[in-house]
Regions:
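Surface-exposed, charge/polar-rich loops and edge strands
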Residues: 6-9, 13-334
Length: 334
């Protein structure tokens, strides 16, 4: 069977148009949503994840990090760990912890942290848009981290972590989002243990769904703000399923991946800093010479944010430096 590509060509501007589609959600029952909610899987080490799952047995982390259900002697990436994740997920669906909606919808997802609200739309993005660079990337990925999420998503046949996407704000979408938030009762509204308030509304009106879909087609480029490994993993699972189903038509769920899209005027990009406790036995002079092997070093009078890829601000012994990666370092995966 001839396969159907998932992108459209805008003949007027000769560009691809993004496909951001509604989906049938498998989501927590409202009575337990605050208990199911969990931080991203990769912010915990194994011991911390086990402790969190012990504290809250309904936490999604129990699915995301199923090695918590095994003794430490079992490897984190053992096949039985992924099988266990699938078993837990299916049991929770059977027990009504998760429910399945009946129609394809978009969902408004609003977060409030320290009094600041950020609101986006949960939807499915296209594997082909990722492959054709309609969805822009700005980070490299590590294969071992990708493989973990590939096995997880493939075993569960479920997208278990949304990709954080950003797009240029569009009035047509904003108007629908504002109206639904004002008029409709939210599906969920709770404050998690980390103090962040999560509120979700469903966009179910067919005219709203269609208008949002059309509005996204005219957005142009979309950017990955966070979740490069999750995105690459989801796409690889989609490509794997295509090979396994050579007659695929393009409408199958594996051709899409779960995302939350935020307009640019809602975004607050926070620093992603690292604190190093010691110099691993080196003196400061020795440490700076090691740094100089791979970076050009500029002394600064005060703190300064990096303004492009390959630059790092460093604070050492009361002084700021700007490090600029040398050419041979820029092509190494992070």
């Amino acid at each position: 069977m001839q396969t159907v590509t998932l992108y459209q060509r805008d003949k007027m501007e000769d560009k691809y148009m993004a496909i951001i589609k509604p989906f049938v959600a498998v989501r927590p029952d409202a009575k337990v949503a605050d208990r199911v909610a969990a931080l991203p899987y990769d912010v915990y080490n194994r011991a911390e994840a086990s402790k969190e799952v012990e504290r809250e047995p309904l936490s999604f982390l129990k699915i995301d990090r199923a090695e918590t259900q095994f003794p430490d002697s079992v490897d984190t990436y053992a096949p039985e760990v992924y099988d266990k994740a699938k078993e837990i997920f299916e049991d929770m669906v059977s027990d009504g912890i998760y429910i399945t909606d009946s129609d394809e919808c978009y969902y408004i997802y609003s977060l409030v942290m320290d009094g600041r609200r950020q609101t986006g739309i949960a939807a499915c993005a296209s594997v082909d848009d990722y492959m054709n660079n309609v969805i822009k990337k700005h980070e490299n990925t590590r294969e071992e981290k990708e493989q973990d999420r590939i096995r997880h998503v493939d075993t569960l046949s479920a997208q278990t972590g949304p990709i954080f996407l950003a797009y240029r704000s569009k009035k047509e979408i904003n108007d629908i989002v504002s109206r639904v938030m004002e008029q409709d009762k939210p599906l969920y509204d709770f404050t998690a243990v980390d103090g962040i308030t999560h509120t979700v509304w469903k966009i179910a009106e067919k005219s709203d769904v269609e208008n949002i879909k059309k509005a996204f087609e005219n957005i142009g480029e979309i950017y990955i703000a966070d979740g490069h490994h999750r995105a690459a993993s989801a796409v690889n699972v989609g490509l794997k399923r295509r090979k396994e189903n050579p007659g695929y038509e393009g409408t199958e769920e594996f051709n899409y991946f779960l995302s939350v899209l935020f307009p640019d005027d809602q975004l607050m990009i926070m620093d992603y800093n690292r604190s190093v406790r010691d110099l691993n036995g080196l003196t400061e002079d020795e440490f700076m010479k090691k740094i100089e092997e791979h970076f050009d070093i500029e002394s600064l009078e005060e703190a300064k944010h990096p303004d492009k890829k390959g630059k790092v601000s460093m604070y050492l012994s009361g002084k700021w430096y700007m490090l600029t990666a040398k050419e041979e370092l820029l092509n190494i995966t992070d």
